[in-house]
Amino acid sequence: MIESYLAFIFLNKVNKKKAPSLDSLGYEEIKKRHDELVKLIRKYDYAYYVEAHPLVSDQEYDNLYHELETLEKLHPELITPDSPTQRIGETPLSGFSQVTHEIPMLSLENTYSKEELFAFLERIKRALPGKKISFTVEPKIDGVSISAVYKNGLFSLGATRGNGTVGDDITQNLKTIRSLPLRLETPDPPEYLEVRGEAYMSPKDFERLNAQREKEGKVLFANPRNATAGSLKQLDPRVVAERPLAVVFYGAGKLVGMKCKTQEEWLNFLKKIGLPIPIVFWVCSNENEVYEAIGKLNECRNQLPYPTDGAAVKVNEWEYYSLLGYTAKAPRWAFAYKYGAERAKTRLNNVIFQVGRSGTITPVAEMDPVFLSGTTVSRATLHNFDQVKRLDVKIGDVVYLEKAGEVIPEVVGVDLNQRRGTEKEIVPPEFCPSCGEKLSWEGIFLRCENENCPAQLKERILHFAQRNAMDIQGLGESLVDQLVDKGIVKDVADIYDLDEETLVNLDRMGKKSAQNLLKAIEESKKKDLSRLIFGLGIPHIGQKASEDLARYFGTMDKLSHATEEELLNLPFIGEIMARSIVNYFRKEANRRRLEKLRKKGLNFVSTLSQASSGTLSGKTFVITGTLSEPRESIAQKIISKGGRVSNSLSRKTSYLVVGSDPGSKLQEAKKLGIPLINEQELLEMLHGG
């Protein structure tokens, strides 16, 4: 009977005949077939999306998938969370909730130097005298860091790294990625399994995606990593499902109900239960084998399906991780060796001058298109005029290109042997190419001091509206050009005065587009203070610093009145950053902008802010020495309970937290009579003990 039903499903596609009633099959037969289909499709998904070896034709796969959809439509009670039909949600999200990483997601220290790599390996051996140590060498994948949680084998939570301590809940978006199994392939799954890795887009898929976007008149993505990050930030999982994303896992987070002894054992375990892992990795017993493996990886990395920019070298034995510990930002048991940037050669045809949001003039080279590190490049930065002089680069030269950080194309050299004598000097402009104001030099930088400069305003608006700031979807480059050029928007705050009547009269803006944009603008008012701080574009203040400032000060009023001295006491703020913040809020134009944003109803209070009446309220802590967790993670826990963390001791310091190998602060605290506590005592205070 089931075979008869399958035959009719297929014939239905060809002859448009109706399938027989499923009632005649019997419920148990239907349920059994449903389970078979789920397992079959999961098997075919793994073969196609992970192993790149399809087991059936597209038509056969589609027939099975359609049959499963039909069964579940007629019997919705059969739908399980791991069914392939449940990957794509029907309803867009209103926003991303936050996920706290119980074990922080850290980055790796890195180097381009063989000597520094060997020094790292030597430090490991010195820290573990007499121990037998081996190392793994894995591809350092240039994607977006993610965490995936499986409870009793079922995928239940996905998150971004965020600031390492708190990330975004992207569960619904990760479910759309076919290489991520919704259920682990094991009859005895761990109670709780957190795996960490990367979401990525292959260079070939990236090129195809951009080609399609170009046909549709959409803004192109800069590189595969940006395309991946932008896709995961989409609120509508249906949009994410259309993007060619994949995942690969290599790291461990929180584990309950399982143990591994080595990184090699962990990777093999992940592969066994159906999770995609790096295609190649090596286990090495000494530094020479490590360096040899790094060389082998470099030879084959362009054949891998994911972009890589180096090798991750890790201590293989997990038991040593707690002994080696962590720095403030990275584990001491792992290190990244980065390969020298890939180079390309092309002719420089022209130089244009771009005006940044702070008024800095950047010379940009226009060149014959050339393929470089996964993308076709026709423009590259020359950074500044000091760099132009140092390279002795001229219009008409054949130049060498690299991608800074594997992202931004830059001119790094000139092939002087190909000079023809017709090349032209690159002359710095005397007047701003946007507003016509006379330019002035500030060190090696050429700047436009006119804050009303249209080019600066456009860049400020685009920065303010970007995904990591106020996330105003629809406010792209083309529309911003029109709004500024027509004099409709003269300040960032003016975007909150836009109305439907104004927008529908602009090019490529219909009624629906205008309504969607206005909705996005209204929604942006609810964004957390951290996003607003980042969106303001304060020089030297990035996304993470913005989150830290919002968490510490809690309100825009407190931040805007902070002194340089107060800022310098924060563990995450340096001298240049502190001065930049104070100078920003001193400017009258910036104060006026903030007041207008306040009146328009933007959120000036952070949900990330420290508890005003927490267990550590009113107490100030200074940390010295090495703790079991990164210092930044400990500091965030103190702040979340209402406490403050400072870099320097004073008579107002409540406690000095003392870890192993403390510095000079220990003696200084004793002289000042400041109470000393260890990490365990701090943890008891954090939990109200």
UniProtKB/Swiss-Prot annotation:
- Biological process GO terms, please? DNA repair; DNA replication
Domain of life the protein comes from: Bacteria
PROSITE patterns the record matches: BRCT (PS50172), DNA_LIGASE_N1 (PS01055), DNA_LIGASE_N2 (PS01056)
Listed Pfam families: BRCT (PF00533), DNA_ligase_aden (PF01653), DNA_ligase_OB (PF03120), HHH_2 (PF12826), HHH_5 (PF14520)
Q: Name one GO cellular component term.
A: cytosol
Annotated keywords: DNA damage, DNA repair, DNA replication, Ligase, Magnesium, Manganese, Metal-binding, NAD, Zinc
Q: Which reaction does it catalyse?
A: NAD(+) + (deoxyribonucleotide)n-3'-hydroxyl + 5'-phospho-(deoxyribonucleotide)m = (deoxyribonucleotide)n+m + AMP + beta-nicotinamide D-nucleotide
Q: Where is the active site?
A: K140 (n6-amp-lysine intermediate)
**Domain BRCT residue range list:** 611-689
Task: Report the transmembrane regions from the record.
Answer: none
Q: InterPro entries, per this entry?
A: BRCT_dom, BRCT_dom_sf, DisA/LigA_HHH, DNA_ligase, DNA_ligase_AS, DNA_ligase_CS, DNAligase_adenylation, DNAligase_N
**Family matches, as SUPFAM superfamilies:** BRCT domain, DNA ligase/mRNA capping enzyme, catalytic domain, Nucleic acid-binding proteins, RuvA domain 2-like
| Signal peptide region | none
Cysteines paired by S-S bonds: none
Residues reported to bind Zn(2+):
C432, C435, C448, C453
E.C. number(s) listed in UniProt: 6.5.1.2
Q: Which residues bind NAD(+)?
A: D58, Q59, E60, Y61, D62, S107, L108, E138, R161, E198, K314, K338
Query: Which terms in the Gene Ontology molecular function aspect does this entry carry?
Result: DNA binding; DNA ligase (NAD+) activity; metal ion binding
Asked if the Swiss-Prot or TrEMBL record annotates the protein with the keyword Metal-binding, the reply is yes
Cofactor(s) the record lists: Mg(2+); Mn(2+)
Gene3D superfamilies reported for this sequence: 5' to 3' exonuclease, C-terminal subdomain, BRCT domain, DNA ligase/mRNA capping enzyme, Helix hairpin bin, Nucleic acid-binding proteins
Q: Which family does it belong to?
A: Belongs to the NAD-dependent DNA ligase family. LigA subfamily.
Q: What does this protein do?
A: DNA ligase that catalyzes the formation of phosphodiester linkages between 5'-phosphoryl and 3'-hydroxyl groups in double-stranded DNA using NAD as a coenzyme and as the energy source for the reaction. It is essential for DNA replication and repair of damaged DNA.
| Name by which UniProt lists this protein | DNA ligase
What is the species listed in this Swiss-Prot or TrEMBL entry? Methylacidiphilum infernorum (isolate V4) (Methylokorus infernorum (strain V4))
Q: Which gene encodes it?
A: ligA
